[in-house]
Amino acid sequence: MTCCEGWTSCNGFSLLVLLLLGVVLNAIPLIVSLVEEDQFSQNPISCFEWWFPGIIGAGLMAIPATTMSLTARKRACCNNRTGMFLSSLFSVITVIGALYCMLISIQALLKGPLMCNSPSNSNANCEFSLKNISDIHPESFNLQWFFNDSCAPPTGFNKPTSNDTMASGWRASSFHFDSEENKHRLIHFSVFLGLLLVGILEVLFGLSQIVIGFLGCLCGVSKRRSQIV
C-alpha cells in the first residue's frame, strides 16, 4: 500500500464520521422543535438550522468524495489512477459544502437563537438569504447573547460596561435547563459550535485529499498481487 492509498483510506473514514456528525448536529434543533411543539417550523430554536448546514453542506455535499475515497483505497473497486483523480475532484465539492457549513455556523453564533432576536420566537422573522453572511464583522462576534444572564434586549439606556460583561461571563457557568431561554441558548451554541468544527475539519480533510488524489493519479497506486492458482 502506498502512502497515497493509506491517506485516502484515512480521509474516507474521517469524512464519513464528520458527515454523520454534521447530519446529527443539524437534526438536534429540528427534533427538539418537533418534540416541544409537535411541529417542525412553528417555533424554531433559530432560523439557521433550516439552511441545513450540516445536512446539506457537511452531509450531502461530502458524500461523493467520501464514497470515492473509500472505493479508491487499497483492494477497493476504484483503486486506480482514475479513482484517485475522482476522489480529488469530488473533494472540491466537499470543501465548498464545508465552507457553506462554516459560514452558516458563524452567522448563527453571531446572531444567537431566535428567542434573543424576536420576542414572538416565530419563523416569520427568518430571512433565508445568503447575503446576510456578508454582514459578519469580527468586532460584533462577542457572544454576549450566550454569556449574559439573559439574551433579551435591555430595556434601559445604559450600555453594559466591560466589567458587567466579564461578570456575566463568569455567571454563564451556572447554565441549566431551568428555562426555555437557557435551553435554546445552550442547544444553539452547542449545535453550531459543533457544526463549525465539523466544517473546519472537513475543509482540512478535503484539501488534503485533493493533494493526495492528484499525487496518486500522477504516481499511480500499488499493483494487486496476481492470484496463484
UniProtKB/Swiss-Prot annotation:
PANTHER family: TRANSMEMBRANE 4 L6 FAMILY MEMBER 1-RELATED (PTHR14198), TRANSMEMBRANE 4 L6 FAMILY MEMBER 20 (PTHR14198:SF17). Keywords: Autism spectrum disorder, Endoplasmic reticulum, Membrane, Transmembrane, Transmembrane helix. Residues 1-14, 66-83, 207-229 are lumenal. The chain crosses the membrane at residues 15-35, 45-65, 84-104, 186-206. The lineage of its organism: Eukaryota, Metazoa, Chordata, Craniata, Vertebrata. This is Transmembrane 4 L6 family member 20. It is a multi-pass membrane protein. One of its GO terms (cellular component) is membrane. It is linked to Specific language impairment 5: A disorder characterized by a delay in early speech acquisition. It is usually associated with cerebral white matter abnormalities on brain MRI. Some individuals may show disorders in communication, consistent with autism spectrum disorder, or global developmental delay, although others ultimately show normal cognitive function. Penetrance is incomplete and expressivity is variable. Changing residue 80 to Q: No effect on glycosylation upon ceramide treatment. Residues 36-44, 105-185 are cytoplasmic. Polytopic transmembrane protein that inhibits regulated intramembrane proteolysis (RIP) of CREB3L1, inhibiting its activation and the induction of collagen synthesis. In response to ceramide, which alters TM4SF20 membrane topology, stimulates RIP activation of CREB3L1. Ceramide reverses the direction through which transmembrane helices are translocated into the endoplasmic reticulum membrane during translation of TM4SF20, this mechanism is called 'regulated alternative translocation' (RAT) and regulates the function of the transmembrane protein. The gene is TM4SF20.
